[in-house]
Amino acid sequence: DTLILSVGLIPAGDIANGSGLAVDGRTRGAFVDEHYQTSIPGVFAAGNVLHVHDLVDFVSLEAEALASSAAEYLKNHALPPCPLEVRAGGNVGHVIPQRISGSRDFTLSLRVSRPMKAVTLTVTQDGREVLRRRLPKALPAEMLQLPIRAAALEQSGDLEVSVQ
């Protein structure tokens, strides 16, 4: 068993070099599913190793979700598969997680790619609107977090997140 802690602001992608761990080119951090499991089964990541966080509160929430997933993994020796991809669409810099199961509620974290006022954030699945939220503004320096209910999702079809 191993626990690696990386304390700092910028994602430490060099930890993944040579490990076979998939890295997201947009965040320069680990590629994770809704369980915060990386591309290597049983290896989990949260916090700034995924993407830069502006508030430690979000890091703490990710760590709690990761701990729950890691405990489930240790108990069952596996987690439900996450075949659905989550993609950053128009005006979105990146999204976390990059893969989901479609059968569990999860929190979507994202940053917009440019400052915007009076925005509409939309999550679609195969062109069908899953969530729409209006915001007075969105800034690249401020992470947005959105709870996504599994009941709103289909069991197949990738998701795209966009901001207009």
For each predicted feature, which ranges?
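Solvent-exposed, conformationally flexible loop/turn segments
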Residues: 103-105, 138-143
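Solvent-exposed serine/threonine-rich low-complexity stretches and specific carbohydrate-binding patches
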Residues: 128-141
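Beta-strand-rich binding/interaction modules
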Residues: 117-127
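Short, aromatic- and glycine-rich surface loops/edge beta-strands on solvent-exposed regions
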Residues: 108, 121-123, 148-164
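Extended hydrophobic-aromatic, low-complexity segments
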Residues: 53-58, 119, 131-133
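A conserved FAD-binding loop/helix module that cradles the flavin
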Residues: 46-90, 95
